[in-house]
């Protein structure tokens, strides 16, 4: 954990957040105002890093930092290891879940980080052969799930259970709600608009559709914006 200091300024007192010059800090997905994250994208995203590895290039781990609000404490929950690359984190049940793929060892690791422990603990380990590639390999909630949406009109649930079904290329998963998956879909006909599609697991059949977008708020409430 790095120390957070106050610096004198002609404008006002400022809290210094030292994350090695990485300026792309943003909120962790999943409805929290408590956690932010930043990474250096040294090889681009997870899929781009995988392509480099498959082409025989060395892959260094990206550095991923979690920043806690309001105290400004900075954590590096997963130590960098050559051949490893980190995906997007997500907030789940009071902890931050992290995705780490080790191309050298051919494994996918899912980890949880809590501020009390200050280190991430592994909760699942899968062979990398479980997926064709890491294109759109992302963690979602809730419950915590590993999903993949390749650019071929299919959706895959990889963990904790398996499911696969067809969907529109204009759909993207917003969140999971038990045995239901809530997708955003956009249209241009000709005006731009968005809808929510609620699909059932495991077959993906559509249960509901309605205009708007559901946002998960910091207190866990879901707001339908329309």
Residue ranges and their predicted role:
Residues 134, 169-170, 178:
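Low-complexity, Pro/Ser/Thr- and charge-rich linker/hinge segments at domain boundaries
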Residues 32-35, 93-94, 141-144, 178-180, ...:
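Short coil/turn segments that connect the beta-strands within blades of beta-propeller domains
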Residues 26-44:
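N-terminal "first-domain core" detector
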Residues 135-143, 148-152:
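Long, charge-rich C-terminal accessory regions
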Residues 71-97:
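Blade-loop segments of beta-propeller domains
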Residues 36-40, 97-100, 145-148, 182-185, ...:
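Residue position within the beta-strands of beta-propeller blades
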Residues 29, 90, 138, 174-175:
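Conserved beta-strand position repeated across blades of beta-propeller domains
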Residues 2-25, 48-80, 104-130, 147-173, ...:
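Surface-exposed loop/turn elements that mediate protein-protein interactions on large endomembrane-trafficking
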């Amino acid at each position: 954990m790095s120390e957070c200091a106050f610096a004198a300024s002609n404008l006002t007192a400022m809290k210094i957040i030292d994350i090695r010059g990485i300026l792309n800090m943003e909120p962790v997905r999943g409805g929290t105002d408590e956690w932010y994250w930043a990474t250096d994208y040294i090889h681009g995203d997870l899929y781009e890093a995988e392509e480099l590895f498959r082409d025989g290039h060395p892959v260094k781990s990206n550095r991923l930092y979690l920043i806690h609000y309001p105290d400004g404490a900075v954590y590096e929950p997963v130590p960098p290891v050559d051949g490893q690359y980190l995906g997007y984190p997500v907030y789940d049940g009071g902890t931050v879940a992290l995705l780490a793929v080790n191309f050298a060892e051919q494994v996918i690791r899912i980890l949880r980080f809590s501020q009390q422990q200050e280190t991430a603990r592994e909760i699942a380990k899968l062979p990398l052969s479980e997926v064709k590639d890491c294109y759109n390999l992302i963690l979602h909630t809730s419950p915590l799930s590993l999903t993949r949406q390749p650019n071929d009109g299919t959706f895959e649930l990889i963990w904790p259970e398996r499911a696969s079904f067809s969907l529109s290329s204009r759909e993207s998963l917003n969140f999971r709600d038990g045995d239901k998956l809530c997708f955003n879909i956009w249209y241009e006909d000709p005006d731009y608009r968005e809808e929510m599609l609620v699909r059932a697991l495991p077959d993906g059949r559509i249960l509901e559709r309605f205009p708007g977008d559901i946002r998960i708020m910091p207190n866990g409430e879901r707001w339908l914006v329309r």
